[in-house]
Amino acid sequence: MDSFIFLRSIGTKFGQLESSPAILSLTLAPILAIILLLLFRYNHRSSVKLPPGKLGFPLIGETIQLLRTLRSETPQKFFDDRLKKFGPVYMTSLIGHPTVVLCGPAGNKLVLSNEDKLVEMEGPKSFMKLIGEDSIVAKRGEDHRILRTALARFLGAQALQNYLGRMSSEIGHHFNEKWKGKDEVKVLPLVRGLIFSIASTLFFDVNDGHQQKQLHHLLETILVGSLSVPLDFPGTRYRKGLQARLKLDEILSSLIKRRRRDLRSGIASDDQDLLSVLLTFRDEKGNSLTDQGILDNFSAMFHASYDTTVAPMALIFKLLYSNPEYHEKVFQEQLEIIGNKKEGEEISWKDLKSMKYTWQAVQESLRMYPPVFGIFRKAITDIHYDGYTIPKGWRVLCSPYTTHLREEYFPEPEEFRPSRFEDEGRHVTPYTYVPFGGGLRTCPGWEFSKIEILLFVHHFVKNFSSYIPVDPNEKVLSDPLPPLPANGFSIKLFPRS
C-alpha cells in the first residue's frame, strides 16, 4: 500500500512544481542523474550476455507488478508469466535493484548452496533496519556461524525435547481458554495469539496476559513494517514499525537487566528459555553477545517463528477438509496416540516422531502455500549460469513458486495430496521443495515450528471430534506475507465427548 501512496505523492509533487522551472530543474537533476547511473550500470557490460527480461521503470522496476500478484489468489503468476516468456533465467528489477530470477531446482541449488562463495545475504533495507544489523539474518561468514551455534542451544533437538512439555501445556491451556465451549471460532486470530503466547513463554518467560498482548501488538507492527517500502514519514507502515521496535527494545532491555540479576542469584537457569541461553552463551574465545545482538536476534526469532508457523496452522484444517481420506488418517493417527496415554500423561518426543500422516499434511500445506515468496541474495562475483552472466552486485532471486507449483515436479500441483511426502519425501527431487530455504541459511527454527504445528493438531483432535468450515472455498491471500485465509477461516466446532 505504501508503494502506491509513494507513487501518487510523487505525481502530485511534480504537478505542483510545473509552475517553477528553476525548482523543477533542481528537483529533476538528481533524479535524472540516478537514472543515468542506473542505465550505465545496466549497460556498461556490453561484452557479457545478460539474461533476457526487462527492468521496468527506473528505481521502481517491476516491484508493483510483483506486489499485485502476491496479493492475489495466484501469487505464482508473476514468475510463471516471465518463465513462459523468457525461460528459466530472466532479469527484472525489484525494490530498486536489478535482479536475476533463477527458476527450477538448479536455480534453487545455486542460490541456496553457494553462500559466501557466489552470493551473500542482503535483504531489503526496511527488513534489515527493523530486524536488526546484529541479527543472524544480517550476519555473514564467521559471525553468522557463531550465532547459529548460540541459537542451536535453544533450537537443537535435545533442547527442544526439554521444552516439549511447556509448549504442549501452553497449547492445551490455549484450547481450554479460547476454543472450548465455543460453537464457532475464527481460526486465524486465535492462531496468531497462540504463536505469540508460546514465543513469549519460551523466549523470555513472560506469562502475564497484558504484557503478552503488548508484545504481540509491537511485534506484528514490526512485521508489517519490515515488509513495506522504507518511507520514514508519519503514518507509513515503516515509521510505525520503527516506533514499535524502539518500544520493544525498551521492554526487552528491562527483561535482560532483570534476568542477568536472576542468573547471578541462581533464581534463573542458563537453559530456562531463549533469553537465558543468549545471555550465558560464550563463543570459542569466551566472548558473549552484546545486548544489541540479543535484542536483534529476539526480533529475528519472532519473525522466523511467525512466518513459518502461522500459515500451516491457519490452513491445515482447511486443506484437510478438502481431502477426506487424509483427514481421516490424521485424526486416527492422533486418536491412537491419545488412546495410548494414561490419565494426565504428557505427550512425548516419541509420540511426535510417530505423527507421520500429520507431518505429511503439514509438508503439503507448506508446498502449496510457502511462507515466503522468494529468497534474495547478492552476487559477490560475476556468476556464469546457463549461458548468461549475472553481474557482481546484482540481486539473485529463487522462488519456491517456481518448483512447488509446477506440474513437472509435483503433478497436479493445485491438489492437496500429502502422500507426495510418503517415505519421508525421499522421492521428491532435491531442491524442488524449499519452504525453509536451504544450505547455511536454512531456517534455524524450522524444527521448533514443526513441533508447534504438530502439537496444535494434536490438541485440536483431543478436544474436537469434527468441524465444518463456514466457507470451504474461502480465498487464500498474501498481504504481502505469508499466505493466509482472507477472512480468518471460521469453523463450526463439534466437541469430543
UniProtKB/Swiss-Prot annotation:
Record-listed E.C. numbers: 1.14.14.105
Catalytic activity: taxa-4(20),11-dien-5alpha-yl acetate + reduced [NADPH--hemoprotein reductase] + O2 = 10beta-hydroxytaxa-4(20),11-dien-5alpha-yl acetate + oxidized [NADPH--hemoprotein reductase] + H2O + H(+)
Domain of life per record: Eukaryota
GO BP terms: paclitaxel biosynthetic process; sterol metabolic process
GO molecular function: heme binding; iron ion binding; taxane 10-beta-hydroxylase activity
Pathway: Alkaloid biosynthesis; taxol biosynthesis; 10-deacetyl-2-debenzoylbaccatin III from taxa-4(20),11-dien-5alpha-ol: step 2/3
Enzyme class, spelled out: oxidoreductase
Keyword set, alphabetical order: Heme, Iron, Metal-binding, Monooxygenase, Oxidoreductase, Taxol biosynthesis
SUPFAM superfamilies named among the record's database cross-references: Cytochrome P450 (SSF48264)
Cofactor: heme
One Pfam family in the UniProt entry: p450
InterPro entries listed in its UniProt record: Cyt_P450, Cyt_P450_CS, Cyt_P450_E_grp-I, Cyt_P450_sf
Binding site for heme: 443
Gene3D superfamilies: Cytochrome P450 (1.10.630.10)
Family to which the UniProt record says this protein belongs: Belongs to the cytochrome P450 family.
Described purpose of this protein according to its UniProt entry: Involved in the transformation of a taxadienyl acetate by hydroxylation at C10 to yield taxadien-5-alpha-acetoxy-10-beta-ol.
Descriptive protein name: Taxane 10-beta-hydroxylase
Gene designation: CYP725A1
